């Protein structure tokens, strides 16, 4: 008789663990709180406009990477969602000449240096660091070879230096404010500089594309792959407690030989078990975890913005919604069939530690009013920067950290962890003990989808080892 495995959460890590465990001979049930799979990697619709709430680029898009094999194994990438590699990657709209990051590193360096000759030396130094990461990739257990680590050695050797600097400090040597703003748009400046070099290198080396259909299409593909393998998913199901031998749902014990917790581990350690976990790693997580939070604004525009870049950096201050920013990034989905014919979906993220601000607004009754104020401020800026949108806004939607928390139970409404300078990641263990496992972004380094899928795969391997099953990846 097959061992029963219950997975708490149907996000990317939960789906991944479920697919591999089901293929490897377990009887797997995924319990998902929401009505759709994917967790924080999701899209949603308002009045015919689809808003991308998860993927903005996908590490593992490049077919030369081990991570790409994993995305294929779990069925995330199929014929129904081919990868699109936007080029330019980012364009700074500053009222003068547009400034761009292209997928060609030499072209980008040449244009930035021509725009700001006084920064030529600093730019060459930064781009040398970025070049060191051209062979760097997320290691995948059982796939990444010794030769791969040898090729990654140049990046590994400079990582300590970059890890000790924030992106903001690392880029402070750039004197021209436009060039500096464009580069800071790649990754939030509070993170360590290694994340900047790695991310920018991905754009320059044929990675970090966008899957057609976005987050939801990927998640639906994975859910279909899981069910096709024989697994079961129960949506709209909240797990109340994880106990020895199973989980409680609506007061009923669902028995299992093993439980894999893939919801936010920071939330789980305090709320999901009979008593809060007090292991050393759990105490460190409570003390040190730095969360990535954002305010999301999406609008539907009754205008075709196909002539505008896919990702635009607006060098315009935004001080509202608990954030104080000197610039922000706007995503243009005119070419992605995310809206009615002749119309366009436009979204923007406003990162910052705004959870407390929004929580206070909820408590004092001004939450909806402040969401509306954020929406109107964004619309005003959008109409100024892109005149075609003026008076053409058909729908607007705002998601705050409280929104993410309500739907996904993420700690402080965060969508991943920040990786700050001088700090190690505060990770939950993939294997807590035989029969109880963790997977998800809080079990690995920061970075969105890659640690989610890699940790789900690793946890399935550990499960197989404990129960003496052969790990099957196809």
Q: Which residues does each predicted region cover?
A:
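N-terminal glycine-rich phosphate/pyrophosphate-binding loop and immediately adjacent elements
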Residues: 2-132
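Short loop/edge segments at beta-strand edges and connector loops
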Residues: 9, 235-237, 243
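Hydrophobic anchor at the start of a short beta-strand
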Residues: 26-28, 259, 391
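A conserved FAD-binding loop/helix module that cradles the flavin
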Residues: 55, 441-463, 467
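Active-site/ligand-binding neighborhood in enzyme catalytic cores
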Residues: 131-229, 236, 407-420
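A glycine-rich dinucleotide-binding beta-alpha-beta segment and adjacent secondary-structure elements
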Residues: 177-190, 387-446
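Mid-domain catalytic core of redox enzymes
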Residues: 240-341
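C-terminal segments that line or cap access tunnels to active or ligand-binding sites in enzymes
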Residues: 302-402
């Amino acid at each position: 008789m097959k061992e029963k495995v219950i997975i708490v959460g149907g996000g990317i890590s939960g789906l991944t663990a479920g697919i591999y465990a089901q293929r490897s001979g377990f009887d797997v049930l995924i319990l998902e709180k929401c009505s759709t799979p994917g967790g924080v990697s999701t899209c949603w619709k308002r009045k015919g406009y689809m808003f991308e709430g998860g993927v903005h680029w996908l590490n593992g898009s490049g077919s030369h990477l081990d991570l790409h094999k994993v995305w294929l194994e779990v069925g995330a990438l199929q014929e129904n969602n081919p990868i699109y590699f936007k080029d330019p990657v980012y364009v700074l709209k500053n009222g003068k000449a547009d400034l761009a990051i292209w997928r060609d590193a030499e072209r980008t360096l040449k244009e930035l240096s021509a725009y700001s000759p006084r920064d030529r030396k600093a730019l060459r130094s930064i781009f040398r660091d970025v070049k060191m990461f051209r062979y760097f990739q997320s290691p995948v257990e059982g796939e990444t070879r010794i030769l791969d680590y040898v090729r990654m050695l140049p990046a590994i050797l400079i990582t300590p230096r970059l890890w000790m600097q924030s992106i903001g400090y690392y880029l402070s040597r750039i004197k021209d404010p436009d060039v500096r703003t464009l580069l800071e748009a790649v990754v939030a400046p509070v993170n360590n500089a290694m994340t900047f070099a790695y991310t920018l290198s991905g754009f320059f080396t044929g990675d970090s594309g966008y899957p057609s259909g976005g987050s939801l299409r990927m998640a639906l593909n994975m859910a279909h792959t899981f069910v096709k393998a024989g697994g079961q998913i129960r949506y709209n199901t909240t797990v109340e407690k994880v106990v020895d031998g199973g989980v409680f749902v609506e007061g009923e014990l669902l028995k299992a030989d093993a439980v894999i917790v893939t919801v936010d581990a920071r939330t789980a350690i305090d709320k999901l078990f009979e008593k809060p976990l007090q292991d050393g790693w759990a105490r460190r997580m409570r003390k040190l975890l730095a969360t990535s939070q954002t305010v999301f604004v999406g609008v539907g525009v009754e205008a075709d913005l196909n002539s505008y870049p896919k990702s635009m950096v607006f060098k315009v201050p935004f001080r509202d919604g608990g954030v104080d920013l000197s610039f922000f990034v706007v995503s243009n989905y005119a070419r992605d069939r995310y809206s009615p014919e002749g119309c366009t979906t436009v979204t923007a993220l406003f990162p910052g530690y705004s959870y407390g601000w929004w929580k206070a607004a909820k408590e004092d009754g001004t939450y909806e009013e402040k969401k509306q104020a954020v929406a109107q401020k964004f619309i005003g800026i959008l109409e100024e920067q892109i005149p075609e949108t003026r008076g053409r806004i058909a729908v607007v939607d705002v998601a705050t950290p409280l929104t993410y928390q309500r739907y996904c139970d993420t700690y402080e409404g965060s969508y991943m962890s920040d990786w700050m300078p001088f700090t190690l990641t505060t990770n939950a263990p993939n294997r807590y003990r035989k029969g109880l496992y963790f997977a998800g972004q809080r079990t690995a380094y920061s970075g969105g989808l890659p640690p989610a899928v890699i940790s789900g795969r690793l946890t399935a391997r550990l499960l197989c080892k404990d129960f003496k099953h052969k790990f099957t990846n196809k």
